[in-house]
A protein has these predicted regions:
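Surface-exposed, short loops/turns at beta-strand junctions within beta-sandwich domains
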Residues: 13-20
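Conserved structural position at the C-terminal beta-strand
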Residues: 25-27
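Acidic (Asp/Glu)-rich catalytic clusters
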Residues: 77-88, 101-127, 185, 221-227, ...
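Metal-dependent polysaccharide deacetylase catalytic core of the NodB/CE4 family, i.e.
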Residues: 89-177, 200-204, 269-275
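Aromatic sugar-binding surface patches on proteins
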Residues: 4-10
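Active-site-adjacent pocket scaffolds in enzyme catalytic domains
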Residues: 101-104, 163-164, 173-266
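Active-site beta->alpha N-cap acidic-glycine motif
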Residues: 35-118, 165-167, 267
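C-terminal domain-boundary segment and adjacent tail
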Residues: 192-196, 264-313
Length: 313
């Protein structure tokens, strides 16, 4: 396809009709050429989801109470309210254990049928072995990551069912070695989310992506695929517990005005701020997330899990 030059850029129209397209730009005078891969996700734009990090306390509550339904747990009941009202799909990243003596092995499978019946709007995935230490997988190798991810996935399948699993997760602290990410990928997680903070931020939260170019690309465009490792990285849009309630809508409005950053909206919040016993409890936790979800719906975003819109096809 011949390109035209506008004094600054060479441009040419091309049609994307498949997931992966290799594009080659060639100088017909010198023979010099450059190639790149383009990925087309036709259903990616205009979608949103809720994602929850650091989850373990609600699971301990389920284990310690004789509830007739998982939705007698106030935490899960709130997310069901959002589903019932807006159709919101919620992705929950969980720990294997808490900071005391509880592990998810103590969960009964008595609610398994109910988990499965709600799998059209709920997901459970591996987050980490536990909340502490911070940055637990910063230097972890393949075997350490595999040990923890396999343990959590096995428990999810046991007490909730494989229907709740999927190829997407957010790793605790979002820092890992390439070997650790290979273990995640081999366990089934080939779509990874994080903050991907731009330099010179001291906490990249960017898995093994250490170059400024990769981090800036993800910060500005919200998606990048490592073709060598067969892993797709996606940036979350907002961490709601870090914002005042009145700041949420203006922040999301700003994102939506940028077509590169506002295509898919991941509304992230952490579990602990929901619970009154937590020292940094946020009484308006529900209001924050209802505000964020209502904004998404009123701005035309539809609920979707990432495996429905970002997986290879």
């Amino acid at each position: 396809v011949p390109a035209t030059f506008d004094g600054k850029y060479h441009t040419a129209p091309i049609t994307l009709s498949q997931y992966e397209t290799r594009v080659c730009a060639r100088d017909t005078k010198t023979g010099e050429q450059a190639e790149m891969l383009l990925y087309w996700l036709p259903d990616f734009a205009g979608k949103y989801r809720v994602s929850l990090d650091d989850n373990i306390w609600f699971l301990r509550e389920l284990a310690e109470h004789d509830y007739r339904s998982i939705f007698e747990c106030a935490y899960l009941a709130f997310w069901k309210e959002l589903y019932d009202e807006f159709g919101t799909k919620t992705h929950i990243n969980i720990y294997l254990k808490d900071d005391d003596d509880f592990t998810i092995a103590a969960l009964s499978d008595r609610y398994k049928a109910e988990w499965q019946a709600n799998s059209h709007w709920l997901r459970l995935s591996f987050h980490a072995r536990a909340n502490l230490p911070a940055q637990p997988y910063l230097n972890a190798g393949y075997d350490e990551m595999k040990r923890d991810v396999d343990a959590v996935r096995a428990e999810i399948e046991r007490f909730a069912g494989k229907e709740l699993l999927g190829p997407v997760t957010t790793l605790h602290w979002g820092d890992a070695t390439v070997e650790g990410c290979r273990a995640l990928r081999d366990a089934g997680y080939d779509i990874l989310l994080a903050d991907f903070n731009p330099p010179p931020n001291n906490y990249p939260v960017a898995y093994y992506l250490t170059s400024d170019t990769e981090r800036l690309h993800l910060f500005d465009r919200f998606a990048w695929r490592d073709t060598k490792e067969d892993i797709t990285f996606i940036r979350c849009a907002i961490i709601a517990n870090c914002y005042q309630e009145e700041e949420i809508v203006p922040f999301l409005d700003q994102l939506a005005r940028d077509p590169h950053r506002g295509a898919f909206i991941d509304l992230l919040i952490h579990e602990q701020y929901f619970f009154p016993h937590y020292q940094f409890y946020q009484p308006n936790y529900r209001d924050k997330m209802r505000t964020a979800v209502r904004w998404a719906v009123e701005n035309g975003y539809e609920p979707a899990f990432l495996e429905e819109i970002a997986a290879k096809w």
